[in-house]
């Protein structure tokens, strides 16, 4: 998993 995937996953969890 790269950083972009991690950021995307966190953003989805945050409701962004």
Curated annotation (Swiss-Prot):
BP GO annotations: chromosome condensation
Q: Does this entry carry the keyword DNA-binding?
A: yes
Asked if the keyword Protease belongs to this entry, the reply reads: no
Cystine pairings recorded for this chain: none
Q: Which domain of life is it from?
A: Bacteria
Write the record's keywords in alphabetical order, separated by commas.
Answer: DNA condensation, DNA-binding
Q: Which GO molecular-function terms appear in the entry?
A: DNA binding
Which protein family is named in the record? Answer: Belongs to the bacterial histone-like protein family.
Function summary: Histone-like DNA-binding protein which is capable of wrapping DNA to stabilize it, and thus to prevent its denaturation under extreme environmental conditions.
Instruction: Tell me what this protein is called.
Output: DNA-binding protein H3-RL
């Amino acid at each position: 998993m790269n950083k972009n995937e991690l950021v995307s996953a966190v953003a989805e969890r945050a409701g962004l």
